[in-house]
């Protein structure tokens, strides 16, 4: 049975889209048929992150009624299927966000997991993704402004008939996780389903247009995202093996030298 999650945030800059991309990639790696749809039709970033910004058909054309959803599905990392939105203002103006309901009706027949990357903040375009998902996951930073805006998004979700599963706290100082978790659960009244630490490899992976769970699979952020994907899918993670360091020239030379002396 398909599970539809909308990934939302109360403000821009929380790392919501990066979380969506990596979570979708990890679900696909765990063997789940997964599709990530960029429903942020005004400020689309999924395509940019994955190098799909120049594809001929996007969600814009589908929502404008000039293309079929099957034409806007592209292959991403680890078998993840991706539906990017366009980056043109004209495409944004022609797209009807209400048609996302119809699009979902087609997608739920094809996948086990459908992730919807929603627009940040409270807007007309963001209401439908909050309402149509089985559950909404909030991406929050450990700052007061982000928490307050996430609370507004939670309230809006409930007003339009949606349900918030919980929140993912992103970019966290690892020494403060316990305090932040308690504060977040108290303010938002939802469980914390994952904590992603601040990780410099996130930016490096983004520059390479590659999800961090693939580029740096044992980095702190990757390990956190893998735990979240395991929790959502019910699939146990394979045991991580530490990378074996490659023997350098000096090491090889030293071995040969001492072998000869022996």
What does each model-found stretch correspond to?
Residues 3-40:
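Walker A/P-loop phosphate-binding motif and the immediately C-terminal alpha-helix
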Residues 37-109, 206-208, 214:
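P-loop/Walker-type NTP enzyme "switch/lid" segment
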Residues 33-38, 45, 115, 139:
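Short beta-strand "acidic-cap" motif of Rossmann-like dinucleotide-binding folds
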Residues 21, 222-229:
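Short, amphipathic alpha-helical "lid/cap" segments that border enzyme active or binding sites
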């Amino acid at each position: 049975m398909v599970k539809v999650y909308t990934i939302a945030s109360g403000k821009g800059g929380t790392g919501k889209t990066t979380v969506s991309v990596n979570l979708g990639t990890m679900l696909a790696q765990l063997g789940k048929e997964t599709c990530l749809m960029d429903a942020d039709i005004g400020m689309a970033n999924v395509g940019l992150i994955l190098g799909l910004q120049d594809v001929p058909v996007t969600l814009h054309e589908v929502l404008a009624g000039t293309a079929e959803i099957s034409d806007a599905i592209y292959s991403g990392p680890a078998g993840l299927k991706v539906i990017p939105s366009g980056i043109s203002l004209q495409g944004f103006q022609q797209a009807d966000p209400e048609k996302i309901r119809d699009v979902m009706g087609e997608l739920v027949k094809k996948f086990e997991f459908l992730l919807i990357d929603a627009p940040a903040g409270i807007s007309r375009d963001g209401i439908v993704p909050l309402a149509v998902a089985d559950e909404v996951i909030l991406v929050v930073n450990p700052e007061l402004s982000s928490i307050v805006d996430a609370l507004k998004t939670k309230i809006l979700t409930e007003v339009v008939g949606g349900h918030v599963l919980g929140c993912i706290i992103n970019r966290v100082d690892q020494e403060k996780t316990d305090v932040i978790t308690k504060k977040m659960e108290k303010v938002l009244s939802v469980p914390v389903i994952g904590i992603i630490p601040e990780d410099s490899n996130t930016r490096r992976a983004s520059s390479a247009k590659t999800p961090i769970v693939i580029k740096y699979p044992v980095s702190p952020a990757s390990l956190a995202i893998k735990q979240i994907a395991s929790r959502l899918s019910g699939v146990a993670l394979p045991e991580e093996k530490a990378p074996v360091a490659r023997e350098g020239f000096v090491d090889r030379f030293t071995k040969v030298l001492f072998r000869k002396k022996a």
